[in-house]
Amino acid sequence: MGTVPANPFKIIQLAFKETVPKAHAELQKWHQEALKIEDVEIREQAAWTVNDKTFHCEGGSIFALLAGENKDNHIQFLVAYQTICDYLDTLCDKNDAHDPNDFRSIHQALLDCLTPDKPYGDYYQYRDRFEDNGYLRKLVDACREATASFPGFADMQTHMQEVSQFYIDFQVYKHVEEEKREPLLKDFYERNKHFAPTMRWYEFACGTASTLALYCMAAYAAAPVQTAQGQQIKEAYFTWVQGVHILLDYFIDQEEDRQENEMNFVAYYRDSKEMFERFKYIDEKATEKLQMLPDKKFHLLLKTGLYALYLSDKKVMSHPRLKAEAKQLIKLGGFPASLFYYNRWIFKRKIS
């Protein structure tokens, strides 16, 4: 296995030269596959999702630096899996029935990605005359093909399935009728609070809503030499690093969600002071857990990079209050966050 980079300059250089271009190539492939879907509405939704959500795959591709010579297969897995996540999120958003059975059924594809010996689920069984010309199955196949090349997949598989299931549960509860969301998410936390008893229910929801733990596990599973255990990674990324990740995502969406009357978990904080205190606490817990991982400097840099990648978003830059608060939040990332912040341009390409 090659040396894992441990300074921000090297990570940016390798992302620019290796992982982001490979992610773009994979995204281009799936954009072309989406355009083959015969149904106009489904085709437009699938193609739009690939083009609009490139940032998820670009940032996630940096985990491939943990995979040694197996970078390409890891990125194949990551892009296909993330494309499924984003595609299904779009299908849920556009569905007026708010049927949890439907949401679980389509998200079965994510578990099928991690269970290569299992038959495909009947993903669209609750949708009348829904035909994507095999698009979702092709994405599942790409994930299965990639994991077949991961030497450590058997050891990571159960942990990957567990964090995937948490993500699915969150997606189901987030997309049901509006009045049911908060009670379901509160119950979700009560049933699982032993994972993070000092988190609040909406912070725990954020900790389940990310795919970072899965991609980190996949990278170590893909590596020719196994250096990390799934339990170690899960305890660090789920729910602490993922909590930082999705809280930042909700932070930048505050104004947009307010205007559209959408649930926003950062809005549950009483004021900016409480928000900063909770961000700091969750960040400190994430740092503490990451210190226990192999390649800890790499993981710590990725965490600080999250601040830069999100807080440099145009939604923040164009809003005076968010911009002022972002200047305070980015201090949690220190110098590396500032460096990533000023190199945000490498992640601004579009897929066409």
UniProtKB/Swiss-Prot annotation:
Q: What is a single molecular function from GO for this protein?
A: lyase activity
Against InterPro entries, the record matches this protein to: YtpB-like
Q: What is its EC number?
A: 4.2.3.188
> Which key words tag this protein in UniProt?
Lyase
Q: Which reaction does it catalyse?
A: (2E,6E,10E,14E)-geranylfarnesyl diphosphate = beta-geranylfarnesene + diphosphate; all-trans-hexaprenyl diphosphate = beta-hexaprene + diphosphate; all-trans-heptaprenyl diphosphate = beta-heptaprene + diphosphate
Signal peptide range: none
Q: Organism's domain of life?
A: Bacteria
Which chain regions cross the lipid bilayer? none
Record has Protein biosynthesis as a keyword: no
Q: Does the keyword Lyase apply?
A: yes
Q: Family, per the entry?
A: Belongs to the large terpene synthase family.
Q: What does this protein do?
A: Catalyzes the conversion of geranylfarnesyl diphosphate (GFPP) and hexaprenyl diphosphate (HexPP) into beta-geranylfarnesene and beta-hexaprene, respectively. Also produces beta-heptaprene from heptaprenyl diphosphate (HepPP) as a minor product.
According to UniProt, the name of this protein is Trifunctional sesterterpene/triterpene/sesquarterpene synthase
The lineage is: Bacteria, Bacillati, Bacillota, Bacilli, Bacillales
